[in-house]
Amino acid sequence: MTDFEKGLRLYDHPDIVQRLFFPRREFIEDTENPTALNYFISLEPGISIGCRFYPFRPDAPNILFFHGNGETAPDYDYVAPVYRKLGLNLFVTDYRGYGMSDGSPTGSAMIRDAHSLFHGFTDFLDARQFKGKRYVMGRSLGSAPAIEIAYHYAQQLAGLIVESGFASVQNQLRRIGMAYLLEHDPEPVGFGNDIKIMEIKIPTL
């Protein structure tokens, strides 16, 4: 059985955290153009994650979006109009330490938090009667939490979308100059994207 917890511990190494995450704080109000609503999901006492919701209409498909490592949810004010033109509701979530969120990012926190963020996303839509199909999408680093959600909650999703994602931990750590951390691990797991995605049977792009 794959030890995903071991893989997450690897991504909490201080050198990896420093090279993998680039948190940037950004505070922004609700806006009308584009229509964007702030929403905060509580993870634990003192820690909440700031999200931005860009609505089209209640019966439209809904995308839970995990962004790349150098972005924040408010950055998507510039991209959201494209999704709106396509008839989509877009829900963008940050990570700890990013945007309007509390705390500091780590690899294990990003994956564990994804579960609470998914439940927060579904609760948000249910409370507002947004009944369209639900998808999860990840870009770059965000492919890891997106694949995690699709792996665990496929029955609640209509599909998975991966943009500029990555598969193996070996290739990712090699790109950021950290491959030496794998010298004593013959079967490194990392986030396990390559393992999890083989088990995902919902439509995937």
Residue positions per predicted region:
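Short beta-strand element of the alpha/beta-hydrolase
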Residues: 60-68
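The serine-hydrolase catalytic nucleophile loop
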Residues: 69-82
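Alpha/beta-hydrolase fold nucleophile elbow
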Residues: 127-140
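Active-site nucleophile loop of the alpha/beta-hydrolase fold
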Residues: 161-171
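The feature captures the conserved acid-bearing segment of alpha/beta-hydrolase catalytic domains
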Residues: 182-205
